[in-house]
Structure formats: structure tokens, C-alpha cells
UniProtKB/Swiss-Prot annotation:
Protein name in UniProt: Homeobox protein PKNOX1
Residue ranges flagged as DNA-binding region: 259-321
Gene Ontology CC annotations of this record: chromatin; cytoplasm; nucleus; transcription regulator complex
Organism ancestry: Eukaryota, Metazoa, Chordata, Craniata, Vertebrata
Gene responsible for this protein: PKNOX1
Annotated tissue distribution: Ubiquitous. Isoform 2 is expressed in all examined tissues except in bone marrow.
Residue stretches of biased makeup (Acidic residues): 404-416
Amino acid sequence: MMATQTLSIDSYQDGQQMQVVTELKTEQDPNCSEPDAEGVSPPPVESQTPMDVDKQAIYRHPLFPLLALLFEKCEQSTQGSEGTTSASFDVDIENFVRKQEKEGKPFFCEDPETDNLMVKAIQVLRIHLLELEKVNELCKDFCSRYIACLKTKMNSETLLSGEPGSPYSPVQSQQIQSAITGTISPQGIVVPASALQQGNVAMATVAGGTVYQPVTVVTPQGQVVTQTLSPGTIRIQNSQLQLQLNQDLSILHQDDGSSKNKRGVLPKHATNVMRSWLFQHIGHPYPTEDEKKQIAAQTNLTLLQVNNWFINARRRILQPMLDSSCSETPKTKKKTAQNRPVQRFWPDSIASGVAQPPPSELTMSEGAVVTITTPVNMNVDSLQSLSSDGATLAVQQVMMAGQSEDESVDSTEEDAGALAPAHISGLVLENSDSLQ
């Protein structure tokens, strides 16, 4: 790559920009200023074409040095890795304006068309320079990411291959073992076996594995408890090491998958807080966002966990309660429908035309008073002639009437503290052929 060269406005002076202008009008040579003796005149000067006139107008324009500088910056941005920035061009513009003002030179010429052409050309190159700067930044970002990825991959390969610098290399093993030897535990002190034996066991690296120094565990009293490694060399193959590492990674992945599959159990404190809120607002068990945030702060849960718990609670706790209450409602209505006045067992003409004597009362074991009203043609003696089956049936009807009244009071007066005792007005028996 080409080295980045420093460009400035000073490198584009009037003298240098005139070098690119082709002078079509050649001056006469001093040696050939006089015609020869034969009177042959010099060849006539060729006339300038319109293109040549336009070129001269561009080269002689006051903004041409700035245009050339910008063009050079764009070329350098495409050739080298270190591209020029737009900020440096802004500085060059300031320097150019300051220099033109200092020297008293104009910024434009007498031709407005040429001035417009130069300004537009500078604007186009300026936009091109900005785009090149963006591309350069993207390239640098890509290179940095790619290099970081390569470094990570190379470090992982070095870790598995056991090359120098990896944790499984002999150098790293010596450092780890030296750190272990200085560790004191309640069971004993771990020291190299070479420190206890006359012959030292040297460490060596063989092809395909690493040889480790044997280690012996010694109690604080100086007694040898056990020798954790054999005095011989221990060789760990790289393939076995890589296989073991792969197995460990697979176990870790399985543990992660099993932990994800397990359903999370919320703390008991959190469920108690949410359950209490649910029953306090059982009429409208839908917490607002602020209430959810407050509950999440109290229970150390996330908003998602709180929201899911309330959704499940409305379906699993409140819905069964609502279903059970709906199933008991028909029974209540059925019992209420049974609460009707005692049906008369004789014609209305007899009941309205005959005066009734004072009733006779019988006391039951439950404390209910049963009043038996006898018509004119019946007396107490005729009541004694009732069969036992008829009397039992009459008492059962009285008890059922009392129960129906109690249940009707429960269904219609839910806010009452206690139920009023049922008063049974009387039991009217029909003087029919079946009871005689």
C-alpha cells in the first residue's frame, strides 16, 4: 500500500497549476527571430479549439487548487488503509480561504458558468470523500471483528491441542502444581513427591501427551498419608483430553436443557402475597400495571411471572369456585319453591261456613308447637281414632313445612345475623273416609 502523503494548498500554487496548461502560442526563438536571406516567414500559429479554451479557463480559475487537493484526497482514500477524514478537508478549506484573503485574490472569475462548474465539482468530490470515509469505517469495524473471532478460535484450539501457553501445557501445569504445593488444608499439605524421595522424578513432554510429577499428601505432623499419583509418569493423550472435554460440554448442555424444561416453582411468600391480593379483589381480580409492578417489587418477581400467575389463578382458583356456586343455585330455588301454604284437605264451603272451636295443642320433642284444628263434626275422641300411620304422616308434613320456611329465610335474608324460629300456625286435617 502507498504511504499517505500530506497534501496542502501550498502545493498548488499559481506557478504549478500553469504547468499543466498547454501554451499553444509559442514564442519565437531568438536565434530565429530574423527571417533568412530567402525571406521565408515562420509558419502561422494554429487557432485554439473551444476545448482548449475551456481547459485554460478551468486551470486558471482561483478554485482550481482546492479542486485538485480534494481530488488527491479521494485518491489517497481509495489507495491506502488510512483514509483521510472530512475534518482534515474542512481545515484545508479554512486555510485556502485565509490565504486568498491575505493575498487579496478573488474566489471567482468573470465567467459565471465556469464558477458554477467549479463549485459543483468541489461539492461532488466532497460528497465522494464523505462516502469513502464511511466505507473506511465499515472496513475497519469488519477487520476488528474478524481478528477478534480468529483470536478466540485460535485460543480455543490452543487450549485443546496442549500447545505451550495453554492450561494443559507443561509450563502451565508446573505453575498450577507449584500453586498447589503451597496450599495448606485441614487434612494435610500437598507437596511434590520429589521433595520426600531421594531420587527426583523429572518432568518431560512426550509426543501426544504431558508427563506430570507425582504428588504426595503429608499431614501437619510430617507423616505420609497417601500418595495420590504413582511414582511413574502419567500420560494424558490429547485425544482423550478432547473427548473428555466434549463429554463435559455435552453434559453441561443437557443440564441447561433440563433446567429449561423444568417448570419454575414460585416462592411461597410470593404466592401468599398474590393470593391475598386476589381474594381481596375477588370482585374484579384484574390488577393494573402499577399494581403488578408493586406486587413484583414485594415478591421479587418479574412482571411476566406476576401476570402469568394471575392468569392461572383466575382459571384454576376462581373459576372452580364460580362453577361450584352455580351448581348449588338450582337446589336453593327448588327448596324455595316448596315453601307454599298448607293445602286444605276439605272443601272451602265447609271451612267458611262452620265456626272452629279453640284449637288443641301438642308439644313435639324438637320444641315445635303443632296446632290441630278440629271441625264441628270432629271432637277429641274422633282424633284419638286416627291410625298411627296417619298421625305419622301429619307430623312429617308439619316438619317439612318448618324446614321449607327455614330455608326460604336463608335464601331471602342473607344479611341477617340469626334465623327467627319457625312458627307453625296449625295443621288442618281432612275428615275424609281414609282417616275415619
